[in-house]
Amino acid sequence: MNTAPWRIGVDIGGTFTDLVMLDSRDGRIFNGKVLTTPHAPEEAVLEGVRDLLARTGARADAVRHVIHGTTLVANALIERRGVPTGLITTKGFRDILEMGTELRHDTYDLFMRVPEPLVPRHRRLGVAERLLPDGSVREALDEAGAREAVRALRAAGAKAVAVCFLHAFRNPIHEARMREILSEEAPDLTICLSSEVVPEIGEYERASTTVCNAYVQPVFERYLRRLSDGLRGFGLTGPLFLMLSDGGTVAEETAARHPIRLVQSGPAGGVEATGIYGAAAGARDILCFDMGGTTAKAALIDNGEAKRSLDFEVARVDRFRKGSGLPLKVPVIDMIEIGAGGGSIARVDRLGLVRVGPESASSDPGPACYGLGGARPTVTDADLVLGYLGAESFLGGAMKLDVAAAEAALGEHIGKPLGLSVPEAAWAIHETVNGNMAQAAAIHALEKAKRIDAYAMVPIGGAGPVHACHIGMKLGLRRIIVPLGAGVASAFGFLAAPISFAFIQGWVAPLAGLDFAKLREITGTMTAQGKAMAAAAGVAPEAASARILGAMRYAGQGFQVEAEIPAESITRGDAAMLRAKFEAAYLALYGRTEPSLPVECVSWQVIVAGPRPVVDLTQQGAAAEGTLHRGTRRAWFGGAYTETPVLNRLALRPGESVQGPALIEERECTLVLPPGATARCDAALNLDVTLPA
């Protein structure tokens, strides 16, 4: 077993790439942040790793492993930068990607926009074959027609092929044979089968997910090869692990086969981190607020556990409207996008209202204040002009910000159209962003039958602590926990995530009279697969654990509720226990149950995980770094500039308190502490903020 002391976490965002290097011997943590290189994302990773090795003095062979999360998969889908992909499906069903379901995300809009399918119609082909809902063969696969379809797709320029036959999740026999034919006729094509990517009921969602996986897989595989080669070039011989969207990590080889499982990998690391930070501060109910350079996301953690979901959307045509994107059936941590990021561009609409996002300046050209060619105002430009960010101290002074360029962009695009001064224009952007995010977070909590003011906020991301207190006051929160290293929290979260993978198998059957022998076979097979995968990633067999979850519903419903099922209840065939677990989960979501209705099982999931790495936050800071007071800076509070103390975050020690207004800076982020708020440094070096009533 590799016992090298250093571990590295890397998160590629739309604007910055964040890195954390942890010494497992004494808990020392070193953070890094570099501009993302969109044309070749691995270049930013390698630059950041090179810098960390130099700063720590660590040898490359002293690095145990690198754990990596990235927006590459999501961005490839949003920006349509995958490879030309084909779809082979059951004859008569090739238009499923356009037909979708009967659900409309805007019922009354006759001109409602929907996402364009990733596969155009001329590369969607049907092949004669048919399985019945129970998986039995009604019509054998037409192999001659299958070969013709493969040749047609090659002629049409396809580089990857998704195969999605009707009811294949119940019996993969035809999809497996289709793969053999594809390998014979076109061995250079990437092949993805729906029975392997998402073996669940729901033809449209299954097809969409499989197509998305095929569309990005060649791009992602090439990226992983370049990154692995670059790391080995440094002498890093330890394995590369990838963060999944549900909070687990997997070996590089597994991630290469299932890139769609990484669609939310970066934000998932952030949620993992906030749970650790909150627990260190004694908080169990947490609002994770993650505001980076491109977007802001929120997630609720109840009693120390983040909720998971099997439904997600990407590439929405209407950013905040559910149902307007490409549906994915993948395990994800339940979170929502609630607003813009630091690089989001502000504008005035035709009604004279300030709008922010979704368009982002990203890292190239970036906000106007970066001096890299950006000329349109962003949230970061507004925060700089308001005095919340320091022009000379951004990224620890490694990157100087151009205040004049930010003022010019704000005045031209916001101030002039609205008749506002430059500071007023900056405040309009700041308030618009904060108001939108507060409203979205409150609605998200209400949809979960929760009160948002019952949570403590943990803000992370480079822009999170800048906006946290103002958003918290709008939400009526009393407590905000700001961790040390909040600006690189997602990368830190990767280091605390276990080796884990979720296996799913659809099997629709009534609970009454359920064939428990078949269920034991299904869950046993998935458990064995998971333990083999964990062992390949270095987890000892005795250290791997398995959880079983069942997705169930009342007969006749079109949605299901997931509940954790004790393995012993399956062993002894206890249908009453399964129903009790389902109804407890249903009651928690909807406040009622229907005892008279029969229950139907829809799918089963086994999550196999290794032990969770232990990260002791109390070891983060061995000694204070630098002096506490850095002087003052004019910052905007109460409608005017106020000379505000600027403090060094790394010089604050446990037990010390700061009264607002104050600007508390560290290399990767700044906490804006408004008048009336108090921040106390706790034993884990969190800043525990109490907001004014």
Task: Map each language-model feature to its residues.
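Conserved short loop/turn motifs at secondary-structure junctions
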Residues: R64-H65, A162-N171, N213-V216, A426-E431, ...
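Short beta-strand-loop/turn "lid" adjacent to the catalytic site in phosphate-handling enzymes
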Residues: F30-K33, A58-L103, L166-E175, V198-C212, ...
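C-terminal, non-catalytic interaction/recognition modules in large multi-subunit enzymes and RNPs
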Residues: A4, I12, A144-G157, S265, ...
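N-terminal glycine/serine-rich phosphate-binding loop of ATP-dependent small-molecule kinases
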Residues: M1-G86, L132, E139-A162, E175-E180, ...
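Glycine-rich beta-strand-to-loop/alpha-helix junction loops that act as flexible
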Residues: T70, F165-L166, S194-E196, S245-D246, ...
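Glycine-rich phosphate-binding loop of actin/hexokinase-like ATP-binding domains
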Residues: L19, N31-H39, G86-G92, M112-R113, ...
